Amino acid sequence: MIQEDYNMSENIIYCYSGSGHCLNMAKTIAEKLGDTDIVLMRSFPEKTDATEAKRVGFVFPCYGGGLPGHVEDYVKAIKIAPDAYKFAVEQFAGYMGCGLHKIDEIVDLDYSNLISNHSTCIWLMPHTLCVPPTSKENARARIDRKAMEVAAAAKAMKHSEKKPPKKAFFALEDKLFSQMHSKRVKKFWVNDDCIGCGTCVRVCPQGNIQLTEKRPSFGTNCIGCLSCVQYCPKQAINVGKITEKRERFPNPNVKAADLTKKIIHID
């Protein structure tokens, strides 16, 4: 049973998701663990006191070689019991980056894992350009298998043999990503297929999109989640020319409304 809930559960998974793939993975893990709160980190987490949780997990993607948005600051605000079991899993497109290492530095992970999802990075590396090439269906199947692996490890409280590597190059890229992205956000535009439904406004975690006469206008506070691009029902939103001919692939099990929730409880 899935519901919104604010009581303390046995397990908590903190999740950041832009195209729904990480949230779907978090749900799969939670269903296997049972009695789990999934706390969204698209904005400041609704629940930061995790001191009563037996297990605390983190599910997130790699953005620009590091953590997405303000996730690093959010994780620093979370209170975890000293004896809690802590795990994390990262999804990435071309390379793993240093996100797992950053989480480990903050919370001292007991277990970590990662999965390459070549079908998620619409503007950097679409799955048709990846080596080896893969389909959306195959990518999702791989993620589902990885979710089951992580869930089994977390349930058994398995410990990883090695800590996540720092990857100095990716740490440098992470610092430069915000500068590069600030130029990219100026290239958002909407074609004539837009119906003014406001989905983009609702899924933007930064409040960066406004509707003016039923047309979205974009501010400069974008963190690159691309939820607006992925979940537009008419595929009317683009970033420059690069996304025009690239297919969208939001997770079919995650609706736009799911991304706007603060906490999802799974029994």
What is each residue range found by the language model?
Residues 162-170, 178-197, 207-212:
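A charged, amphipathic alpha-helical module
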